[in-house]
């Protein structure tokens, strides 16, 4: 059976991996998952992103902890296959008053809400991370 929402699965694996104090998690890779993971790594929510080569590439994410607690307090899917959420540049949300980030899919690629605002771009809100 095929997976309905691979992005929600990725976010759930990150959430569950940190709840279980795992060092790293792995999952099937895709360009979108790698782009989202790279944004999370740039923002400091995960430690490392690695993609294995092969017939079925695997995405390995090294999770990050601070003083024994997970860096990611909450990660939630916003736009989903059954209900896509799009926002204009001036409607992009500020997660936790600017302390968290919204991952946005724009015409210029996957980026944070801050970068999208600076570039003057709107797009699909993929998830909120705090």
UniProtKB/Swiss-Prot annotation:
GO terms for molecular function: rRNA binding; structural constituent of ribosome. The gene is rpsH. This is Small ribosomal subunit protein uS8. Part of the 30S ribosomal subunit. Contacts proteins S5 and S12. Gene3D superfamilies: 3.30.1370.30, 3.30.1490.10. GO terms for biological process: translation. Signal peptide: none annotated. Keywords: Ribonucleoprotein, Ribosomal protein, RNA-binding, rRNA-binding. It comes from Histophilus somni (strain 2336) (Haemophilus somnus). GO terms for cellular component: ribonucleoprotein complex; ribosome. Pfam families: Ribosomal_S8. The lineage of its organism: Bacteria, Pseudomonadati, Pseudomonadota, Gammaproteobacteria, Pasteurellales. The keyword Ribosomal protein applies.
